[in-house]
Each structure stands twice: as C-alpha cells, then as structure tokens.
Amino acid sequence: MTDTMSAHMDRHNKLDYDGSEDEKKTKLCSLKKKAINASNKFKHSFTKRTRRNSRVMSVSIVDDIDLEELQAVDAFRQALILDELLPSKHDDHHMMLRFLRARKFDLEKAKQMWTDMIHWRKEFGVDTIMEDFDFKEIDEVLKYYPQGYHGVDKDGRPVYIERLGQVDATKLMQVTTIDRYVKYHVREFEKTFNIKLPACSIAAKKHIDQSTTILDVQGVGLKSFSKAARDLLQRIQKIDSDNYPETLNRMFIINAGSGFRLLWSTVKSFLDPKTTAKIHVLGNKYQSKLLEIIDSNELPEFLGGNCTCADKGGCMRSDKGPWNDPDIFKMVQNGEGKCPRKTLSNIEEKTISVDENTTMKSDSFAKNKFDAENTKFIPMIDKTVNASTWPTNLHKSNYPEPEDLYSAVKPSQRRGGEGYLFGGVMSLVMGLMTVVRLTKNMPRKLTEAAIYGGEVDKAETTMVSNQEYMSMVKRMAELEEKCRSLDNQPAAFSPEKEQILTAALSRVDELELQLAQTKKTLEETMATQHVIMAYIDKKKKKKKFFGF
C-alpha cells in the first residue's frame, strides 16, 4: 500500500513538473515574441524619426580610379609628404592624379608643378579668397562678358557657357580692372572645386572633376584682340594651366565661321590627338550635336534647348545646377561630395575577395592549384611603393621616349593645361594664326608623320649606330631646351607692331563709320526716290483721268 501511494505521488509530481515545463516554454515563447515586436517597433519608429528629422541622406560615390593610377598617386603622395608639400586640404588622390596626368606621369615634373601651385596659392591668398574677396561689379561684368554655368550634361558634368561674340572688352575694363577680374576668376574656380563639382558628384553618384564648355564665337572679330584683352587672357591662361590642370572634359566651339574652321583644320594636325579629341569646332548647325551630350531641359533655349530660366533673369544669370539644391548643398558642407582617400589596401583587398569568390565555385583541386600558381601575383597590403624607382613601367630604358622627342612641337600638352574660359579660346585663335604663319611652307604630311609617328610606306630602313643615335638625342634635347626657353618668354608686341595694330584698328573703325554714314545716305536717297516715284505715279493717274 505504501508502495502504491508513493508511486501515485511520483506520477503526480512528474505531471506537475511536465506542466511547469510546458508553462515555462509558453511563457518564454510569448516573451520572445513580445521582445521581437518591441524591437521591430523601435526600429521602425527610429527609422521614421530619422528620416523625418534629417532629410539629408548619405550617398555612395563611385570612384573609377584604377590600381595603376592609384600606385602612381601613392608614390607621388609619398614624395610630397617627404618634402612637406602636402597640406591636409589638398590630400586628395584625384587632385594629385590631375597633376600627374598633366605631366604625363613624370614624377619630378608633376612635383615641380605641385610646388609652384602651393607657393602661388600662398602668395595669391587663394585659401581665403572666397571669404575675403567681394566682387561687387559682378552684374556689370556679366553684362559686358556673358558667361556662367547652366545645368549639367548627360554624364553629370557641369556645363559652362560663354558668348564671346557679345564681349565688349573696352566697357569691361571700364567697370573693373584686370587684377580684380583675375581674382574673381580664381574665386569662381575655387567655388567650382569646393561646391559645384562635389554637388555634381553627389547628384550623379560618381566622382566628377571636369566640365563641359560651350563657346559661342559668333561675332568675334579683331576688336576682341585689344591690348587689354590680350593681357587678361594671358594671365588667366597661365593661372589655369599651371594651377588647375585637366579640368576640361570637352569643348564645343559653335557658330564658327569658315575662316575659323579653316585655321582649325590646318592647325589640328600639329596638336596632340588627346587635346584635339576634346575640342569640337561646329558651324551654325550645332543643335543636334549639343543635344546628344546635354538634355534639352538643361540646355538654354538660345542654344537649341527648352530652358529659359525666365524667373531668374535668363539662363546666363541663373547659375542653374544641383549645387542649388538645399539637401545636396548641406551634404557638400558636410564633406560628403568628395571620395574618401583610397589606399592600395582598399583595391588589393577587393581584388583578393574577388579571387576568393571565383575560386569558391570551382572544385577543391582546382582551388588549390589556383592558389599555388597565383600566390605570387597577389599584391601585399603592407607593401609600400618606392618613389625613387617609380614608375618603372613608364621608362623602359635610359633613352628618351619618342613622345619626349617631340614635346617641343606640342608645348600646349607639355604645359598640361586646357585653357579655361575666354583666355583659353582667345589664346587658341591667336596660336592658330601664329602657327599657320610660321608653318605655311612646311609639308603637312611630313609634319604629321613626324608628330604622330604614323605608319607610312615602309621602305628599307638603314641601321643607325649608337653614336649617331646619341648625337641625335643630344641635338633634340638642345632644341627642346631652346624651345622651352622661348616658350617661357612673355609674349609681347614691339612698339612698332603695336602702333601698326592700333592704326589698323583705327582704320577699321573709320571704315565702319563711313560705311554707316554711306548706308544712312543711301537709305535717305531711297526714301526720296520712293516719294518722287509716288508723285510721278500720281501725276500719271491724274493726266489719264482728265484725258490730256
């Protein structure tokens, strides 16, 4: 009996225990569900509150720099740090890459160019020019020199427009001075790099550091080449090419007359193909070409687009672009418009991860074989680039490259700049005239063969001895040095030529005045003739009416 009671009690206790376990599991499940629901509610409420309180969301900007360029930039950066030439403000791999490209990845030349830029910024006060310089005469300047940014092209680059045919250099110099305009030009360049280009990068979600330029040359004549205009464009061109290299993506010169296009087609063969590929000289049927690059809503109406900016005083005064968006502007102020500085480790880790993902899809034998064969090709993250031996892939021997032998023929490429604004184009036109005059007796095909090294009829070549080759290299180096010294000399007119040019311009003004007077006299004569003819017709009708 006692055993029966104990067995019954044990079974009862076991049932109670099982019941308590079930209750415990049920409570745990309910608590877990409550915790998950509370967590989800908190997460959703936090997300909504974050989106409601902060409309500025971060974006990822695609950086298209490759490994080879990054290695060059890293070597260049180490060289600048060793000489204390890299302020934190300019520690930007894209900025350093532009200087390297301007000097064809020659480390020493790029370093010298960078050094000159740093010294110029200190002397000119560029770092504070946006806050210190107030260009009060901006409205008058834009009246006599229509220019400005308007929208972006289909790739997200800002579009810069100038109407050179409407430039009045005389009145422009009456409302401002050359020094003040140069400061305004530098201030706008700094504004472009600090605000406009980062805003375009955010809007396009990719890095942008170049612009598209449209130059309307309709009406450009001899009056555009006054002494003041020449001085202004020379200073602007030097500043742009020395301190803001590689900022032009492409340029469209529209409404170009037959004379301008003839000069361009002649001089085009003497320029670097990379430079000429950026410049498109068009006539008066340019609308379709521009619409291929720029959307019609971003192109002003006077250039064939649909935009008028009537509420902002016209397209040339509107400064239309993504930099006017408050959210994008706030992101630019927070520094989100620039790509974070890339290191070799970033790209190497990405390369390694891609290799791992690829090999995981194969069988283990293939994976082991791949790892064994390619271990030596995986770049080391901790490996540093030796600046003294860089770049070995660009210099295969101790002899000069063929491109260097002809650098004297292409000084514009050697100086590294695309001209910006009015200065670049006016310099181009003046350069065209000069080159055509100096090279009118030079065989064109022979020149093209010398510059581009294109393949011609391959006749039997004679062997050149090492002594003859070194003699030729020495002579070419001397010629290059002479051309460099001539290129560094300031372009100045002699007093006699200045007087001749002034007299020619005065004569043109007199002829234009005489032509206007003659036209006015002719119109008055035509009006008098119409009156006389009307009087004669009236007399004839009257005579016919009375019959005598």
From Swiss-Prot:
Start-end of Basic and acidic residues biased regions: 8-20
Gene3D superfamilies: CRAL-TRIO lipid binding domain, N-terminal domain of phosphatidylinositol transfer protein sec14p
InterPro entries: CRAL-TRIO_dom, CRAL-TRIO_dom_sf, CRAL/TRIO_N_dom, CRAL/TRIO_N_dom_sf, PI/PC_transfer
CDD domains: SEC14 (cd00170)
GO cellular component: Golgi membrane; plasma membrane
Tissue expression pattern: Predominantly expressed in flowers but also slightly detected in stems and immature siliques.
Gene Ontology BP terms: flower development; protein transport
Main localization of the protein described in the UniProt heading: Golgi
Entry's family note: Belongs to the SFH family.
Descriptive protein name: Phosphatidylinositol/phosphatidylcholine transfer protein SFH3
Native source species: Arabidopsis thaliana
Lineage: Eukaryota, Viridiplantae, Streptophyta, Embryophyta, Tracheophyta
